[in-house]
Amino acid sequence: VDGEQLEAAHQALREAVADCQRAGKRTLVLGGGHETAFGHGAGVLDAFPGEKVGIINLDAHLDLRFADCASSGTPFRQLALECDAQQRGFHYTCIGVSRAANTQALWDEAARRQVAIVEDLEVLTAFETRVLPELERNIAQFDRLYLTIDLDVLPAREMPAVSAPAALGVPLGTLLRIVEPLCRSGKLQAVDLVEFNPLFDIDGQGARAAARVAWQIAHWWR
């Protein structure tokens, strides 16, 4: 796709992902912005029309924004509308959400859509009682899982290479504790890593962190 034709890019990614998934493959998509998640997620939904797909987003932001044009803030609202159009459930879990980085309208939409949320503070202070049960629920309840990781969920000190670095965030070691059981579940069908921006990186620090996450996913994925 040439230029800034986001809808065409979404459709091209959607078709490529659906083709791969129908061929028995899994998909790992790298960047750019979180708008990538709509094309990737829609392709997974298209490939498994009769199955329950759980969407797990590791992110400081809910990305359920109302907007006339698609952007990195709209992908999960777009996926919710896609699920509505396909007359299927929208099963969305967001882990690492910053209470300070989302408007009340986004919290209201999340409540209306019955989004399962684990805030960043809960990840840091109640991992065993809030995060692990949510992961276990997703693994038990859904036929397929789609994991999307916005790198701005990491603290700014570990991931400077994003447009909205997190003041608090979920540390890399903790993030990997979330990722590992999903990778080993046998249900993880698709993963993406998004929002890395090399223009904001410091001495390659963010690139190395992102590469380690990608390596661990490939290493653990069953």
From Swiss-Prot:
Cofactor binding summary note: Binds 2 manganese ions per subunit.
Biological role: Catalyzes the conversion of N-formimidoyl-L-glutamate to L-glutamate and formamide.
PROSITE patterns found in the cross-reference section: ARGINASE_1, ARGINASE_2
Cofactor: Mn(2+)
PANTHER family: ARGINASE/AGMATINASE, FORMIMIDOYLGLUTAMASE
EC number per UniProt: 3.5.3.8
GO molecular function, one term: agmatinase activity
Binding locations of Mn(2+) 1: 34, 59, 63, 150
GO BP term (any one): L-histidine catabolic process to glutamate and formate
Pathway assigned in UniProt: Amino-acid degradation; L-histidine degradation into L-glutamate; L-glutamate from N-formimidoyl-L-glutamate (hydrolase route): step 1/1
The protein's name in its UniProt record: Formimidoylglutamase
UniProt family annotation: Belongs to the arginase family.
Secretion signal span: none
Keywords: Histidine metabolism, Hydrolase, Manganese, Metal-binding
Binding residue positions for Mn(2+) 2: 59, 61, 150, 152
Catalytic reactions of this protein: N-formimidoyl-L-glutamate + H2O = formamide + L-glutamate
Top class in the EC scheme: hydrolase
